[in-house]
A protein has these predicted regions:
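Membrane-proximal transmembrane or re-entrant/amphipathic helices at the cytosolic face
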Residues: 415-472
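Interhelical loop/hinge segments that connect adjacent transmembrane helices in multipass membrane
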Residues: 136, 174-214, 254-271, 390-404, ...
Length: 472
């Protein structure tokens, strides 16, 4: 768990630094072009995703032939996606009504091919919880991305982001062979993959549905409000989702293999879900309190060109806290082999998002897209509770002591961050406010845990033990 946290938090912090520095240098239009390209790549990757990596992690006894076959399928899939994107880029750019996006899409089309060339042994490392070696692969890639993008931003503009993205992906791929120590071979024995494909078909459908909502939202913004508005939305979304992405990835990387190994043991599965949910809420509620308080400060630090970013970040912050439950629930569903249930949950969220996106964007502009996310997450949380109520007892996960502890830490973090910002405005003050707010939150959590003898130590010890040993 410790190394998974180092990997994810480190990568997300580097990414945040890269994002903020580039936002100071580049215009929102540049981020709008990147958003279109990233969405385009994501569409074709999702419609061709067969869930091979997840299936390998979930499978109790995957063979060498299955690993090589999965790598071959991934490489062929990425090659098809790359060629298709290069050919379809002008049409996609026209659809978004931004002709300048064409060469950006074509350049980033090579990202899936670079990623797919990585060693499939990474799936085994994930399954066996070797997070230290995974961190040694991802952190250098993030740093290379940062250095290349920031160094070239002044001279190349939006192309600096493209260069950084491709450089980081290449670094990750090369590093995968050093840490995974598995050199895959081309294998066309696809009969070995049928068990994986049967599991992964729901991953494919779920990915398509999830991306449909994101794509539709960005398409509406681009065509009705322009590339600059899409850039503002893209930046706000990335900033607001960073804490949730990092925390969910840290816990999710442990949760998925744990739930897979606890399959058929409902009592232990229930206990694991409660502990993980409690830990996530304890971390994310204070963090998002800081995000909510500091959102206007971030907007001021970035400059007038990023006006209207603050309300979007605040709405998404609330949405992310609600979405924590759904994120963990999906890991439970996948680990238990219920990828069909994960699809239905995603269908509820995306279906709600699609229904409300157009009227909310028409009424509130870019902030309406954030509101659509909030409504979608609420709908998914309600649907998830309905599915879970007969499977897991949740009352311990929302234990009053832990909830009160998180709320107090949130308040302390918010006040500390706001106070530092008032005394020291600017980008440096923003980072100082974040650090002081986090320190205040940690101090309050530890103090209350000691005074009221909360189960915080038990939660942390349990997560560490599971990360290091896996379930018995």
């Amino acid at each position: 768990m410790r190394w998974r946290a180092v990997q994810l938090v480190g990568v997300e912090l580097v990414y945040l630094l890269r994002l903020l520095v580039l936002a100071r240098i580049l215009l929102p239009e540049a981020f709008g072009l990147i958003a279109i390209a990233v969405t385009s790549v994501g569409i074709l990757m999702s419609v061709s995703e067969v869930g091979m990596v997840q299936a390998l992690v979930q499978a109790p006894h995957a063979t060498r032939e299955q690993y090589d076959g999965a790598w071959t399928v991934g490489l062929l899939r990425a090659a098809v996606v790359t060629v298709a994107l290069i050919a379809a880029a002008p049409v996609i750019a026209h659809l978004f009504d931004v002709a300048d996006a064409t060469p950006i899409i074509q350049a980033l089309a090579f990202r899936p091919l670079i990623d797919a060339a990585a060693s499939i042994g990474v799936a085994r490392l994930t399954k066996e919880l070797h997070f230290r070696r995974l961190a040694m692969m991802q952190l250098p890639a993030a740093v290379v991305d940062l250095l290349v993008a920031v160094t070239l931003a002044g001279s190349l503009g939006v192309w600096a982001i493209v260069a950084g993205t491709l450089s980081g992906a290449l670094t990750s791929t090369l590093a995968s062979y050093a840490v995974a120590r598995h050199v895959p071979r081309l294998s066309f024995r696809f009969a070995d993959l049928l068990p994986l494909i049967r599991y992964g078909r729901w991953i494919l459908i779920t990915g398509i549905v999830a991306l449909a909502g994101t794509t539709l939202t960005q398409l509406i913004i681009s065509r009705s409000l322009g590339a600059a508005a899409l850039g503002v939305y893209f930046l706000a979304l990335k900033v607001a989702f960073l804490p949730s992405t990092a925390a969910s990835a840290v816990v999710g990387a442990v949760a998925f293999p744990i739930f897979a190994q606890l399959r058929g043991e409902p009592e232990r599965t229930s206990a694991a879900f409660r502990q993980l949910l409690a830990g996530l809420l304890l971390v994310l509620i204070p963090v998002y309190a800081m995000v909510f308080v500091l959102a206007p400060s971030l907007e001021m630090a970035l400059g007038a060109k990023w006006a209207a970013t603050s309300p979007i970040i605040r709405i998404i912050a609330v949405s992310c806290v609600i979405g924590v439950f759904g994120e963990l629930l999906v890991q439970l569903m996948l680990g238990q082999g219920r990828s069909d249930a994960a699809f239905r949950l995603e269908l509820v969220q995306t279906g709600t998002l699609v229904v409300v996106a157009w009227p909310l964007i028409s009424a509130f502009g870019v902030a309406g897209a954030a509101l659509a996310w909030l409504v979608g997450n609420l709908a998914a949380a309600i649907g998830g509770l309905h599915w879970l109520r007969r499977r897991v007892q949740l009352r311990e996960a929302v234990d009053f002591g832990l909830t009160a502890c998180a709320a107090a830490a949130a308040a302390g973090a918010g006040f500390a961050a706001a106070g530092i910002w008032q005394a020291w405005p600017g980008m440096a003050g923003l980072f100082a406010a974040g650090i002081c707010g986090a320190a205040a939150a940690v101090a309050i959590v530890l103090l209350l845990a000691h005074l009221f003898k909360l189960r915080l130590d038990a939660v942390i010890a349990w997560m560490r033990a599971r990360a290091e040993r896996g379930p018995a």
